[in-house]
Amino acid sequence: SAIFVLSEIKHGFPIAVMEGTLASNMRVAAMGGIAAKHLAVDRPEVVGFIGAGEQAKMHLVAMKVVRPSLKQCRVASRRAEKEDQFIAELSPLFPDMEFVAARTNAKKAMDGADILVTATSAQAPLLHAGWVKPGSFYSHIGGWEDEYDVAMQADKIVCDDWETVTHRTQ
């Protein structure tokens, strides 16, 4: 969740306090989309998600905008009904995309995808290095969602907070 405080310029007094979860989710997804635009392969076709919440939904929208070549979206969640909800909400927006519910099977969602997105609060590895093909783009949004080997096999690590990342690779 997020709260935005809008202040007037001259004295800095608050003039509005707003619920900001939607805008915050859109901002995070925009960052992932911009990264995918510049770092993913030229014509990615498959995007895989672990997580089916609001961050994942916003990320699919951002990824599809910058990478319209995406043809398939695979999604895995802890609960199959969350996968179904994700697909029900997003498939009308992208009729040219095939949606695959992985039925809680993270490997089925991620293995061999061109773009991989983990959007959970998990504190245990969910993404395994063997599922990440060379040249793929991985957007890590939440907690500790991947094996250490995922970062160790990466060609590049691009982040917004190097201190957060460096403790993982030592």
Report each predicted region and the residues it spans.
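N-terminal ligand-binding/catalytic initiation module
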Residues: 1-25, 33, 40-43
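Rossmann-fold NAD(P)-binding glycine/threonine-rich loop
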Residues: 131-132, 136-170
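Short acidic low-complexity segments
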Residues: 97-113, 129
